[in-house]
Amino acid sequence: MGSSKKHRGEKEAAGTTAAAGTGGATEQPPRHREHKKHKHRSGGSGGSGGERRKRSRERGGERGSGRRGAEAEARSSTHGRERSQAEPSERRVKREKRDDGYEAAASSKTSSGDASSLSIEETNKLRAKLGLKPLEVNAIKKEAGTKEEPVTADVINPMALRQREELREKLAAAKEKRLLNQKLGKIKTLGEDDPWLDDTAAWIERSRQLQKEKDLAEKRAKLLEEMDQEFGVSTLVEEEFGQRRQDLYSARDLQGLTVEHAIDSFREGETMILTLKDKGVLQEEEDVLVNVNLVDKERAEKNVELRKKKPDYLPYAEDESVDDLAQQKPRSILSKYDEELEGERPHSFRLEQGGTADGLRERELEEIRAKLRLQAQSLSTVGPRLASEYLTPEEMVTFKKTKRRVKKIRKKEKEVVVRADDLLPLGDQTQDGDFGSRLRGRGRRRVSEVEEEKEPVPQPLPSDDTRVENMDISDEEEGGAPPPGSPQVLEEDEAELELQKQLEKGRRLRQLQQLQQLRDSGEKVVEIVKKLESRQRGWEEDEDPERKGAIVFNATSEFCRTLGEIPTYGLAGNREEQEELMDFERDEERSANGGSESDGEENIGWSTVNLDEEKQQQDFSASSTTILDEEPIVNRGLAAALLLCQNKGLLETTVQKVARVKAPNKSLPSAVYCIEDKMAIDDKYSRREEYRGFTQDFKEKDGYKPDVKIEYVDETGRKLTPKEAFRQLSHRFHGKGSGKMKTERRMKKLDEEALLKKMSSSDTPLGTVALLQEKQKAQKTPYIVLSGSGKSMNANTITK
């Protein structure tokens, strides 16, 4: 402990001085115990010997100071560690402030000896020449430690180093914060205002000061101008600066230059650098401005379009038929090669006055193109749409036709009493009614006109009033043109027309009822008289063929009855009743038309037949058709024989089989007769009237399930598989076939399939079993030798 205190006192006295050895390590004196031991030895051996050994030890210590220093450092490591922990922080700071130059000078002095030593003044002069900080003169320099008083080296403490670094960082952060606060202190915040803004006097003073500064500046400028004019400097300056202004290249020099890009490539507010396009030295072309980035972008877009591999054949492509000047330009046949032959035609525009471009000309050209496109004739038609069940108001306006209403003046006629004899019998006359559906759409609203032979109506007596006699009276049925200036004629209401029709029908019904009552009473009287006469004469009523209500049994009636059982094809949709005719009118028309016209629709049951007409029809059919067809000659070939068999019914085709399955009760073959279906008009109008459009389903086709099977055959008539059919169609479309190897392979495969079909169930495709049997028959053996010969099998064996 005493030694440590002694060393600490020596360090405090030394201050910041230190001595460096030749090996770079400080010398440390030995401990006191070792020193005392050597001293005791030297005292015991003698004075001269001890001094000699002491001197030699000192010289050795000077030579091997490095080695001894390392040993001393190792010996005092533990002691130095304890001492470093007890040192105060102030001494550490002093140690850091030691001058490096002084230590270097001291070390060099110690290592080189007294001969190469410099004084502090000389060292300071030398350091001043080198630009270094001079050494402190007042510092107390202490010589290197001796053996008795060694100098200990400082121990490196990592904790102290870390604390030192943290302290430096804190100091640097505080300094930076101080500088930042100083900089921000000069900036005014939003809440701070200048004092002269609120104070009126300060504001006036500041404005006066600014005005004075302006006046002084103007005076100085005038003074300088006067001095320049006196010495002639102003003219020289103007000439120099004017020449420089003329030499400068400005935007007005860009007028007329061509920019080889589309005007849409430039966006408003975007800065883009344009450079002159590279061209040959001998090319006498105008300068063109381009942008390198836009050129690369256009090239990349073009490469992308080329990679898409669009089809070249576009027969219906609508190209621009006009050029930029709205002139018709010729169309090239192979326009896809124009770019390769003539070169690419880039988009370009010219700069206007001031080096600007607004794209007005391009917009005008686009408007012209749009107008020309609108003038073109369009061949596109309106797409199909569902027919509506009702007419729209617009269609109703076009459908209705206004008629002029004719003013009708009715004359007062004398009342004429109508008797039953005046009415003509309506049952005996024929009516041209519409009993079919061929005129369904056209004559629906037309009431069947009955031609009645009316007695001439007596003309009324001439009136005494000349105005009425000379008046031109027009009727609704007359189609004369109305006089000019007459009011516009309006169409009568449909409801009123319908009411008039119903009233007319009611009137006719009452007349018919009265007439029927009169007829019934007359017929009853006639029947009673005839019955009395027949009883007297003794013959029956049934023999009178013209008597009404009688049934005639003969061959013709039976034939007509049989024909009535055959269904009429094509009249399935003709069961619609006419709306305009009432029930009594239908009965009347059926009785008036007779059986000749009603056979087409109602052939079931009994009906009356006119014998004369039936004979004429039979004669016509007999004369027009032949009973026996001409038979084809068989010896002409196989086709004639097949035709003969088909006509006689010996050969049944697939169509006849299907027909027989569908209609098993059909007695007559389909080849003998045919049914003419002329009901296309009926179907047309019936569908339109019944459903009013094509939105309804086909009810008659509900159970129909089509069975479509498409088959293809080759040249030999063999059915092709889907793959083979596709290959055949593809070859026919492209105009080329398979190669030789594929064709041979396919033919070989077909031959094998043919052999498989021809082979027997008990044999192979090549007939090896049959060949084996033939071989066995020829050799008369139950076996066959596959290799070798039969002689080897029957050879005599060699015996010993």
Swiss-Prot record:
<feature type="cross-link" description="Glycyl lysine isopeptide (Lys-Gly) (interchain with G-Cter in SUMO2); alternate">
    <location>
        <position position="141"/>
    </location>
</feature>
<dbReference type="Pfam" id="PF19252">
    <property type="entry name" value="HIND"/>
</dbReference>
<dbReference type="GO" id="GO:0000398">
    <property type="term" value="P:mRNA splicing, via spliceosome"/>
</dbReference>
<dbReference type="GO" id="GO:0005737">
    <property type="term" value="C:cytoplasm"/>
</dbReference>
<keyword id="KW-0539">Nucleus</keyword>
<feature type="cross-link" description="Glycyl lysine isopeptide (Lys-Gly) (interchain with G-Cter in SUMO2)">
    <location>
        <position position="684"/>
    </location>
</feature>
<feature type="cross-link" description="Glycyl lysine isopeptide (Lys-Gly) (interchain with G-Cter in SUMO2)">
    <location>
        <position position="775"/>
    </location>
</feature>
<feature type="region of interest" description="Disordered">
    <location>
        <begin position="311"/>
        <end position="330"/>
    </location>
</feature>
<feature type="compositionally biased region" description="Basic and acidic residues">
    <location>
        <begin position="58"/>
        <end position="101"/>
    </location>
</feature>
<feature type="coiled-coil region">
    <location>
        <begin position="490"/>
        <end position="533"/>
    </location>
</feature>
<feature type="cross-link" description="Glycyl lysine isopeptide (Lys-Gly) (interchain with G-Cter in SUMO2)">
    <location>
        <position position="749"/>
    </location>
</feature>
<feature type="cross-link" description="Glycyl lysine isopeptide (Lys-Gly) (interchain with G-Cter in SUMO2)">
    <location>
        <position position="336"/>
    </location>
</feature>
<dbReference type="GO" id="GO:0045292">
    <property type="term" value="P:mRNA cis splicing, via spliceosome"/>
</dbReference>
<feature type="modified residue" description="Phosphoserine">
    <location>
        <position position="348"/>
    </location>
</feature>
<comment type="function">
    <text>Plays a role in mRNA splicing as a component of the U4/U6-U5 tri-snRNP, one of the building blocks of the spliceosome. May also bind to DNA.</text>
</comment>
<dbReference type="GO" id="GO:0003723">
    <property type="term" value="F:RNA binding"/>
</dbReference>
<feature type="modified residue" description="Phosphoserine">
    <location>
        <position position="321"/>
    </location>
</feature>
<dbReference type="GO" id="GO:0016607">
    <property type="term" value="C:nuclear speck"/>
</dbReference>
<dbReference type="GO" id="GO:0000481">
    <property type="term" value="P:maturation of 5S rRNA"/>
</dbReference>
<keyword id="KW-0747">Spliceosome</keyword>
<keyword id="KW-0508">mRNA splicing</keyword>
<protein>
    <recommendedName>
        <fullName>U4/U6.U5 tri-snRNP-associated protein 1</fullName>
    </recommendedName>
</protein>
<feature type="cross-link" description="Glycyl lysine isopeptide (Lys-Gly) (interchain with G-Cter in SUMO2)">
    <location>
        <position position="723"/>
    </location>
</feature>
<feature type="modified residue" description="Phosphothreonine">
    <location>
        <position position="392"/>
    </location>
</feature>
<feature type="cross-link" description="Glycyl lysine isopeptide (Lys-Gly) (interchain with G-Cter in SUMO2)">
    <location>
        <position position="758"/>
    </location>
</feature>
<feature type="cross-link" description="Glycyl lysine isopeptide (Lys-Gly) (interchain with G-Cter in SUMO2)">
    <location>
        <position position="188"/>
    </location>
</feature>
<feature type="cross-link" description="Glycyl lysine isopeptide (Lys-Gly) (interchain with G-Cter in SUMO2)">
    <location>
        <position position="780"/>
    </location>
</feature>
<dbReference type="GO" id="GO:0005794">
    <property type="term" value="C:Golgi apparatus"/>
</dbReference>
<dbReference type="InterPro" id="IPR005011">
    <property type="entry name" value="SNU66/SART1"/>
</dbReference>
<feature type="modified residue" description="Phosphoserine">
    <location>
        <position position="591"/>
    </location>
</feature>
<feature type="cross-link" description="Glycyl lysine isopeptide (Lys-Gly) (interchain with G-Cter in SUMO2)">
    <location>
        <position position="699"/>
    </location>
</feature>
<feature type="modified residue" description="Phosphothreonine">
    <location>
        <position position="189"/>
    </location>
</feature>
<keyword id="KW-0597">Phosphoprotein</keyword>
<feature type="modified residue" description="Phosphoserine">
    <location>
        <position position="598"/>
    </location>
</feature>
<feature type="cross-link" description="Glycyl lysine isopeptide (Lys-Gly) (interchain with G-Cter in SUMO2)">
    <location>
        <position position="400"/>
    </location>
</feature>
<comment type="subunit">
    <text>Identified in the spliceosome C complex. Component of the U4/U6-U5 tri-snRNP complex composed of the U4, U6 and U5 snRNAs and at least PRPF3, PRPF4, PRPF6, PRPF8, PRPF31, SNRNP200, TXNL4A, SNRNP40, DDX23, CD2BP2, PPIH, SNU13, EFTUD2, SART1 and USP39. Interacts with UBL5. Interacts with IVNS1ABP (via Kelch repeats).</text>
</comment>
<dbReference type="GO" id="GO:0000387">
    <property type="term" value="P:spliceosomal snRNP assembly"/>
</dbReference>
<comment type="similarity">
    <text>Belongs to the SNU66/SART1 family.</text>
</comment>
<feature type="cross-link" description="Glycyl lysine isopeptide (Lys-Gly) (interchain with G-Cter in SUMO2)">
    <location>
        <position position="414"/>
    </location>
</feature>
<feature type="cross-link" description="Glycyl lysine isopeptide (Lys-Gly) (interchain with G-Cter in SUMO2)">
    <location>
        <position position="277"/>
    </location>
</feature>
<feature type="modified residue" description="Phosphothreonine">
    <location>
        <position position="764"/>
    </location>
</feature>
<dbReference type="GO" id="GO:0015030">
    <property type="term" value="C:Cajal body"/>
</dbReference>
